[in-house]
Amino acid sequence: MKVMHLLPSLSSGGVEQVVVELCQGLCARGVETVVVSGGGPLEKDVTAAGARHITLPIGRKSIRTFLMVPRVAKLIREERPDVLHLHSRVPAWVGWLAARRVEKALRPLVVTSFHGFHSVNFYSAIMAKGDRVIAVSECMKRHILENYPATPEEKITVVPNSVDTSLNFPEYRPSDDWWRQWRHDYPELEGKFTLCLPGRITRIKGAAHLIPLLSDLRARGIPAHAVIVGETKKGKEALRQELEDAFAIAGLQDAVTWTGFRRDLRDVLCACDVTLSLTLIPESFGKTTLDALALGRPVAGYEHGGVGELLDVFLPQGKIPVGNTSAMADLLATWYQTPPTPKSPIPSPFRREDMLQGHLHVYAK
């Protein structure tokens, strides 16, 4: 079997990480794997797994990107993949149109993955046009059926994102060298009740909700400190500055650490006391939430989307009504005194092997 993945880039993000994990698992099972994207920091992880990477600008939201359709069609003819797996809307349009240009004898099975709750319109409908459609959670499947009713339910398979339990487990601890470097880089965290907010710097990630949350906890005498872990992508610099100014106005400039993009997120999650999910709109899954829970770290998050589903399974007390920072402060104040323990070990279908078998089952159809 040969699988070709199309996605915008290989920068940080949940979709990119899932593709890296698929490359690792598929290549280990002898499945020839090719990734087509605009490239990025995670490209080395793809090639280290044994997959090949082909750099093409197929992720830009521009009409010019559709000039890539003939090139991708040519690539399909040359590579002859059995499966064309499309992971995002612009690459999905390019890949779907390219596949339709290929002679039927060479046309691969087209699989699309709904990784997020996209706006419902013609542009997003491409994600439901695959021969097979993967939803990363039950709430994602409901979203597809409710908003794209022409999609037969039997065409949709729920394959949750996963965690590698050989790497993420409650007993895992960062190395002594890592701890020394962490304390050297961020001495302000010593003795603090650290709250990790992972994810790219975007408005919907809810970083602004840290302001009332930190203010409330500090008013109770709890030395709460936010650790915001994620890159500020080009075009988001003004938002980053807006957030920094808001923290400063609230007198919280010394209560926040910005780490930028970190390749060692597993260690960072272990180093922090609690991981937060403050997304203002539902997430389709919540990959970092699962990673933290697998490490035995408590997660407090807004009770919607995939994060709500995960907390239902692993730590129901961590669910907070969306936007209710007062309720979250009450919960965290309790956890400051008595940290909870998430459910362990990781059950099916959230293990890496479950995800790989789920994808192979879809590909085999």
Regions found by a protein language model. Name each.
Residues 35, 298-301:
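Short hydrophobic beta-strand element within catalytic cores of glycosyltransferases
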Residues 13-21, 193, 197-216:
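A conserved mid-protein helix/loop that constitutes part of the nucleotide-sugar donor-binding site
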Residues 234-240, 253-262, 268:
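Active-site donor-binding acidic/aromatic loop of nucleotide-activated sugar
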Residues 14, 167-170, 174, 339-365:
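A charged, aromatic-enriched C-terminal amphipathic alpha-helix characteristic of glycosyltransferases
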Residues 86-92, 114:
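Short His-centered aromatic/hydrophobic patch
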Residues 104-138:
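A conserved, positively charged/aromatic
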Residues 313-326, 333-339:
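Conserved acidic donor-binding segment of nucleotide-sugar-dependent glycosyltransferases
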Residues 36-41, 198, 225-241:
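Glycosyltransferase donor-sugar binding loop
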